[in-house]
Amino acid sequence: MEIILIKPVRKLGKIGDMLKVADGFGRNYLLPQKLAIRATEPNKELIVKQKHEFEAKDKQIREEVEKINALIKDQKLVFIRQTSDDGKLFGSVTNKEIADKLSENVSYNIAHSNIILDKQIKFTGIYTVEIRLHAELNAIVTVIVARSESEAQDYLREQKTETSEDLAESA
């Protein structure tokens, strides 16, 4: 299936790119999400005319996202959970919980589908989590999972000493 992107799509292309994609990917994802349109002759002409409008709209969205990124950047989210003796959680910290807490902290709604977890969070500790804000912009937040507030503060102190040691080594 040939499509024309009307929004930037990570690892696929930018606005106005004409691509050949698998039929299922186009029909089930790109078209319903309004990320692309079919590459018919009328649509090709339309895109040529409206490409500047799409790019201006994308630029405006990117500027808004950069403001949100400034708020999110360097956030530390603390989750207090019950654990077994070896530090394993009864359950896990999900991307939805991270999105809810982050949305609460920055007063901006972050979709849980934008939270990228490398692996499930099932143990106490410090985790780095990536938030996809835009096709070209990601933010990084620190998630701290602990049994108590005092343990969370200990993790924060450890992280500060590690960062100051890293800075001293690089100097």
From Swiss-Prot:
InterPro entries: Ribosomal_bL9, Ribosomal_bL9/RNase_H1_N, Ribosomal_bL9_bac/chp, Ribosomal_bL9_C, Ribosomal_bL9_C_sf, Ribosomal_bL9_N, Ribosomal_bL9_N_sf
Gene Ontology biological process terms, A to Z: translation
Gene Ontology terms: cellular component: ribonucleoprotein complex; ribosome
First and last residue of the signal peptide: none
Entry's Gene Ontology molecular function annotations: rRNA binding; structural constituent of ribosome
Superkingdom as given in the UniProt entry: Bacteria
SUPFAM superfamilies reported for this sequence: L9 N-domain-like, Ribosomal protein L9 C-domain
Swiss-Prot/TrEMBL keywords: Ribonucleoprotein, Ribosomal protein, RNA-binding, rRNA-binding
PROSITE patterns named in the record: RIBOSOMAL_L9
Function: Binds to the 23S rRNA.
HAMAP family for this protein: Ribosomal_bL9
Family membership: Belongs to the bacterial ribosomal protein bL9 family.
Protein name, per record: Large ribosomal subunit protein bL9
